[in-house]
């Protein structure tokens, strides 16, 4: 079954797009069908047809997407539940929304930590302590190295190996600063978060 990376609700006797999950369309694991460049679909639009077949409750919204995963699929959408003024759009559904929904959860957590800490704390989720976990850590930790502390989230971690690399990075000690005459002072080591850290497990 092909999936659109979206939540739906029933309104005015039609399926309406309640939420569109965004991703990174250059990354095959985070491709989001409805947020790709040039796809003119918005939250609040109605999904009226799939490959020329009308879609309306009580039919299951996914029933018309059988066999469409990773295949060009024609959908008809409109801002109203009417065919008048609707538009046909070619999209490519994904086989799984897991990574899109997980990314949304991560980003919601990161924004919440940022808001509640007044921008002082970083948030890093680790899916495991294997290659994907190291990738997540490096990407999120160093992108927030200007923070005063960090929340490391180990919930739903799938296991792996002893995370000595991550432990070493978290345990880095601030040794000093470089004071530049015409620039921003930098730390030594250059990269790191040197303040308090907490882990959610």
Regions found by a protein language model. Give the residues of each.
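Short, small-residue-rich loop/turn micro-motifs
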Residues: 10-12, 19-24
């Amino acid at each position: 079954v092909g999936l659109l990376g979206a939540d739906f609700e029933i309104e005015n006797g039609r399926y309406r797009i309640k939420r569109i999950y965004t991703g990174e369309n250059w990354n095959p694991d985070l491709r989001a069908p409805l947020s790709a460049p040039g796809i003119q679909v918005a939250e609040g639009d109605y999904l009226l047809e799939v490959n020329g077949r009308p879609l309306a409750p009580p039919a299951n919204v996914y029933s018309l997407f059988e066999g469409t995963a990773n295949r060009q699929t024609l959908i008809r959408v409109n801002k109203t539940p009417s065919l008048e003024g609707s538009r046909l759009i070619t999209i490519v559904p994904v086989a799984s929304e897991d990574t899109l929904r997980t990314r949304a959860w991560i980003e919601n957590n990161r924004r919440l930590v940022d808001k509640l800490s007044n921008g002082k704390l970083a948030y890093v989720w680790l899916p495991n302590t294997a290659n994907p976990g190291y990738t997540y850590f490096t990407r999120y930790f160093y992108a927030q190295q200007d923070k005063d502390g960090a929340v490391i989230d180990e919930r739903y971690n799938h296991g792996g190996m002893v995370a000595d690399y991550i432990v070493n990075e978290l345990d880095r000690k601030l040794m000093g600063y470089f004071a530049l005459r015409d620039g921003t002072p930098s730390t030594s080591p250059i990269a790191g978060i040197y303040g308090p850290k907490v882990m959610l497990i």
